[in-house]
């Protein structure tokens, strides 16, 4: 959920996802 479910955010934060 959250950022990792939103592709641009997941791509920008791979260390989080």
From Swiss-Prot:
> Which keywords label this protein?
Acetylcholine receptor inhibiting toxin, Amidation, Disulfide bond, Ion channel impairing toxin, Neurotoxin, Postsynaptic neurotoxin, Secreted, Toxin
Tissue localization of expression? Expressed by the venom duct.
Query: Is Oxidoreductase a UniProt keyword of this protein?
Result: no
**Entry's localization field:** Secreted
Residues recorded with modification Cysteine amide = 17
Molecular function (GO) terms for this protein are:
acetylcholine receptor inhibitor activity; ion channel regulator activity; toxin activity
Which intervals of the chain are annotated as region Ser-Xaa-Pro motif, crucial for potent interaction with nAChR?
A: 5-7
Recorded GO cellular component terms are: extracellular region; host cell postsynaptic membrane
Keyword check for rRNA-binding: no
Disulfide partners: 3-9, 4-17
Similarity remark: Belongs to the conotoxin A superfamily.
Q: What is known of its domains?
A: The cysteine framework is I (CC-C-C). Alpha4/7 pattern.
Chain's role: Alpha-conotoxins act on postsynaptic membranes, they bind to the nicotinic acetylcholine receptors (nAChR) and thus inhibit them.
Please state what the protein is called.
Alpha-conotoxin-like Vn
Organism field: Conus ventricosus (Mediterranean cone)
């Amino acid at each position: 959920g959250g950022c990792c479910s939103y592709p641009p955010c997941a791509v920008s934060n791979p260390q989080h996802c």
